[in-house]
């Protein structure tokens, strides 16, 4: 951090354009509180800038990629939230995504797609024959494995195609590519890594698993068959089942059982992704959907979480829209159970704050404490929309009056009125927090 760091933040505050994008690395052990205060003040303006990155976790991510510590210190955010080593790291980030909502659906339908009615995945057994929750969880894990095997195979094909298409302009920005006359596409960088494999639907997975565990197996409030019938009907005529699903414990509320399940599932996912290697190295996991949670949701029917068919999946590591009811602190505690350092492509947390919070007298101090808590808990990233929901709804109805309204979508900022309606609806539906606690 130096004088230019403050100047860049001030320029962003004064100009308020959606490009160029702006991210900050913050290290509690190294950077002064005055810098954190300036970050908080700019965030409160509501432009979506800057995106905030926990420097210590960023370094850990580079170490987990095999980068030596003396160079990992020089990491930088690139793209949306991906971790990069400028001029030295070859890795196609966010190369392929896999759908965790589909994994749950396929486990409930023995490999079939609810939307298309075809066998879309492998058969993992009739769920009505499962005698324990563990059998159901294993079926979901096998569906995730199946998805990942296909995803990685597709990534390898893309690598083979890319190997035949050199990129000399890009290669000129890599020291070793120039020194050794070896193109970036051929692995000419100093550090060559497997491509990014990114999960979409974190909260959909966890909320669905815990709902089945509680409602079907632990408390026996509903049979598996009745749950399946309710999902087939998109809960129409099964409002009692919908109510039970909605009231089941939810990711993002610091529930101990949900937190433990989150840690277990995402250690499993990281382990499995890292078990695959390309010609450039082991594959690298991430959780950064950009806005892919919206089109991915169009492929997934109703889920045990209570989510209705074809609606957007949860974005990044954020809770499902409207289900985080215990405040921003509880969200952080839940998210901290994901091993962020192992998802070394990057992880993305969107937070929507009401203008009521921004206008409160202690908001800057409270936001600074929130960001410190994020760092202490080992969460990698967060970014904010500071706006009230009614303004977004009005902008959707009367776009001509809101041409300059900036929002943070995922790893990028955009003019709200230029977004598709589905993405606008997704942003509107996010929980709006009026306080930190």
List each language-model region with its residue ranges.
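Conserved catalytic cores of very large enzyme subunits
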Residues: 1-437
């Amino acid at each position: 951090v130096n004088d230019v760091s403050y100047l860049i933040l001030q320029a962003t505050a004064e100009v308020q354009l959606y490009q160029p994008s702006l991210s900050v690395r913050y290290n509690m052990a190294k950077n002064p509180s005055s810098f954190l205060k300036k970050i908080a003040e700019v965030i409160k303006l509501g432009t979506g800038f800057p995106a905030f990155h926990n420097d210590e976790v960023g370094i850990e991510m580079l170490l987990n990629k095999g980068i030596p510590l003396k160079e990992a210190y020089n990491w930088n955010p690139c793209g949306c939230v991906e971790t990069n080593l400028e001029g030295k790291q070859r890795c196609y980030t966010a190369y392929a995504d896999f759908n965790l909502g589909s994994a749950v659906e396929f486990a409930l339908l023995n490999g079939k797609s609810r939307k298309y009615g075809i066998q879309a995945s492998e058969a993992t057994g009739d769920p009505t024959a499962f005698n324990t929750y563990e059998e159901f969880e294993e079926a979901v894990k096998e569906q995730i494995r199946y998805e990942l095997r296909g995803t990685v195979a597709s990534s390898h094909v893309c690598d083979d195609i890319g190997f035949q298409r050199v990129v000399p302009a890009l290669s000129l920005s890599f020291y070793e590519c120039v020194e050794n006359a070896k193109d970036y596409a051929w692995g000419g960088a100093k550090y060559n890594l497997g491509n990014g494999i990114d999960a979409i639907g974190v909260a959909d997975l966890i909320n669905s698993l815990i709902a089945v565990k509680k409602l079907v197996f632990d408390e026996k409030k509903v049979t598996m068959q009745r749950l399946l019938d309710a999902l087939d009907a998109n809960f129409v005529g099964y409002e009692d089942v919908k109510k039970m699903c909605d009231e089941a414990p939810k990711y993002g509320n610091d529930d101990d059982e949900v937190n433990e399940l989150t840690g277990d599932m995402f250690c499993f996912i990281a382990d499995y992704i890292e078990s695959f290697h390309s010609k450039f190295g082991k594959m690298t996991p991430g959780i950064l959907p950009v806005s892919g949670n919206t089109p991915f949701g169009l492929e997934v029917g109703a889920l045990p979480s209570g989510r209705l068919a074809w609606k957007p999946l949860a974005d990044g590591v954020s809770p499902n829209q409207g289900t985080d009811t215990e405040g921003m602190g509880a969200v952080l505690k839940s998210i901290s159970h994901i091993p962020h350092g192992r998802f070394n492509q990057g992880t993305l947390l969107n937070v929507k704050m009401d203008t009521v919070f921004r206008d409160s007298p202690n908001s800057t101090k409270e936001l600074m404490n929130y960001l410190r808590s994020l760092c202490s808990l080992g969460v990698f990233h967060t970014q904010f929309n500071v706006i009230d929901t009614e303004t977004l709804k009005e902008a959707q109805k009367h776009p001509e009056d809101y041409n300059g309204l900036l929002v943070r979508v995922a790893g990028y900022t955009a003019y709200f009125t230029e977004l598709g309606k589905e993405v606008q609806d997704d942003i509107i539906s996010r929980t709006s927090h009026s306080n930190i606690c």
